[in-house]
Amino acid sequence: ELVFGTGEKPKDFLYFYFGTFIGGGLVLNGRLFPGRTGNAGGVGPMPVPGPDGGTRRLFDLASMSRLAEMMEEAGESSDHLWQQHRAWEVSRPILDAWIDGAAQGLAYAILSASALTELEAVLIDGWMPAAIRTEITRRTEAALDRLDMSGVERPQVRQGTVGPDARALGAAAIPLAQRYL
């Protein structure tokens, strides 16, 4: 998103990418922040509340693997999720439950990240149909509305602009960005 995104580019943002697991990146002062070992912004392991009130990791709630697991448990095939991103065949109750869980997890991750870093924006993207990305973004904003953000500057929550190819493009851009940006 930092290199290939379109439109207004915030200087400080957290990027979430839905793939097999949820991943991401942290951009500070207009530059990718890799951290000491290169894993900064790896949002998947962030602790978030689960539906049972216990602590889960974000990737346990907000990943395509979780959606596939839910589909298989309900007797639905998830094979097509991995083959193409334009249209998914998922029953509405399963899709709604997955989006709600993902949005709730994202909201808590955004709150935690915002408490540490003054983020201008959070961008949500991934290997999924555009309508589902739109709905995840909308429900994440609604979940943030329900959290106590006292003392924390709430970032804008927006959709990413690169889409399903962001993971591959981002990986290809890292050496270029390190050398030239």
Regions found by a protein language model. Give the residues of each.
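Glycine-rich phosphate-binding loop of actin/hexokinase-like ATP-binding domains
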Residues: F4-A62
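ATP-binding/phosphotransfer module of carbohydrate and carboxylate kinases, centering on a glycine-rich
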Residues: V3-K9, G50-L181
